[in-house]
């Protein structure tokens, strides 16, 4: 600090600190849809197709009208291990928590895509309750931590 006359000046330069969003924000997100989810244990298929396959078709129809967020993708999978609570979808992205929703119906297709947008924009996969579409609230059944960027402790 310098003193000039009666004024005291701080000569230390103040660098502006920019807060950068973590690299996980806006990372490509993938929506996984379980094709093998059944309608019920009593009625596993309708017209030789499972409920998961119908949900996948409904989601694809919505995507034709409104594309996925940039670099995001859709992947049909054989099983998401939520067989007691069909239909199931999951969301994954680098550096973000993985999320699985269960008890979904064909009517949830648009809400699944709305949530994908919120998940894509989230910092670490924690989407505020207010941003979760009404039809998905209370249906989050699995939350897994993001995988480590690199292994710190390796098994020997």
Task: Label every PLM stretch briefly.
Residues 94-104:
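Short Cys/His-based metal-binding microdomains
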Residues 30-45, 75-93:
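Local cysteine-cluster metal-coordination motifs and their immediate loop/turn environment
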Residues 64-79, 106-138:
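Short Fe-S-cluster ligation motifs
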Residues 22-32, 60-82:
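Immediate flanking context of iron-sulfur cluster ligation sites
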Residues 34-72:
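Small-residue-enriched alpha-helical segments and adjacent helix-cap loops
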Residues 84-85, 91-96, 119-156:
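Short flanking/linker segments adjacent to small metal-binding domains or redox-active Cys/His motifs
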Residues 2-42:
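N-terminal, Lys/Arg- and Ser/Thr-rich interaction peptides
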């Amino acid at each position: 600090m310098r003193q000039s006359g009666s004024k005291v000046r701080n000569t230390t330069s103040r660098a502006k600190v920019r807060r950068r969003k973590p690299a996980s924000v806006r990372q490509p997100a993938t929506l996984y849809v379980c094709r093998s989810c059944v309608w019920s244990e009593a009625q596993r298929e309708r017209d030789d197709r499972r409920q998961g396959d119908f949900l996948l078709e409904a989601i694809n129809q919505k995507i034709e009208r409104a594309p996925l967020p940039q670099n995001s993708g859709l992947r049909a999978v054989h099983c998401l291990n939520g067989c007691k609570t069909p239909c199931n979808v999951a969301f994954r992205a680098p550096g973000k928590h993985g999320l699985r929703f269960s008890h979904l119906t064909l009517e949830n297709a648009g809400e699944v895509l709305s949530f994908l947008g919120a998940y894509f924009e989230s910092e670490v996969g924690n989407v505020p309750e207010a941003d979760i579409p009404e039809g998905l609230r209370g249906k989050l059944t699995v939350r897994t931590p993001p995988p480590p960027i690199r292994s710190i402790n390796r098994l020997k």
